[in-house]
Amino acid sequence: MTNALSSLLDHHLSAWPVPNAAGAVLTSGTTVATAGDQNRIFELASVTKLLSAYSFMVAVEEGVFDLDTVITEQGATVRHLLSHAGGVGFREEDPRKPVGTRRIYSSYGFELLGDRLVSETQMGL
């Protein structure tokens, strides 16, 4: 089963613009096959925004920071970054618009929040 899963991943990786993938087959909660680096941390960008937002809100609830904690030099707060109104672009650090004036879909804003959460809690990924 593991060889078949590895072959399947290799086949799909050749057509995708990504260098790595990992997979697993589970049956009744038991892992029966794995392929790829199971310990690698993958940037899943948009897929993780919901889970990330939940994590940030738990941190707010537990007093790690509040929604109005300033995160960037330009004054973007947790609230701004969660709502894509922090002024930062999709992948850029440089501001694209003044904070709070426009919503710009931003993975980078979530990276900033994640970095701050890790530094405040001393918890890794």
Language model regions located:
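A short, well-structured edge-of-sheet supersecondary motif
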Residues: 4-44, 83
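Active-site helix/loop module of the DD-peptidase/beta-lactamase fold
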Residues: 43-47, 51, 59-94, 119-125
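Short, charged, amphipathic alpha-helices and their helix-cap/turn boundaries
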Residues: 23-31, 76-112, 123-125
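Amphipathic alpha-helical segments within well-ordered protein domains
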Residues: 10, 114-117
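Well-ordered alpha-helical segments within folded domains of soluble proteins
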Residues: 51-54, 108-114
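Residue-level signal for pocket-adjacent positions within structured domains
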Residues: 37-39, 66, 98
